[in-house]
Amino acid sequence: KKSYFNLPKKFKYIDAITDIDTDLQSNFTLNLDKTYKMKNYNFSTQGKVKKVKIKLKNLSSNIVNMTNIDLVLVKDSELKLDLANKKRSINLTGKYTLDNKKYLEYNIKNNYNTKSSQLDLNLQFDKRVDLQLINYFKKDGIIANLSLNLELQKERLKINHVKFIEGDTQINAENVLFDKNKIINLKNLSIKTYNNSKLNNDFSLSLGKKIKIKGSQFDATNLPKILNKRDRKNSFSKMSKNIDIEFGSI
């Protein structure tokens, strides 16, 4: 049976959830005081998600150019959901596809309340990825592994860590802070990438009052063009233009 949900505005990246087929067991508890006023509540459910269709929106980035993604199909997944009056959590593990052909593995954990949200994500990803800043390109069909831990509070986003692995390519970042979609700080970024099987990036980077870049190889083909962009969506506009570089090859 087809189901449809209109989601709250805070789910700005999800437009609709449809075609839901699940086998779940749920439990609800409610505590009242002497005047029968609700003190707290808890709703929990767990079981199998046989299939679900998730329609996405507003997925765009000035940093990463990817294949357009507007629909996710999920199947053969395990769901555990806890909703309390002060905090909530979701744990979902199984398989997903973006093209209704190849299904890949994923795991999502989300803890959230009215003020903040923390997300742990681990998944396989086989769509195109174009990181213009470092001149790295991954073709459609090549599977990469992505792990991510982030915190969201109002208009501030903090990525505690992110790891992207595709073959010999590895990209790791720690403590990346965004304010209104602009990067304002990055503790450490280590990058090792290949272009046409040739090493084109092998360096570490930190962002603060200065941009510090150190390593043996850095593909700066697109860097001047990106840093000088003036459009409102430029994610790098709040970054320092003071760059300290120590390299063997640029």
For each predicted feature, which ranges?
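Membrane-proximal interfacial segments on either side of biological membranes
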Residues: K1-I250
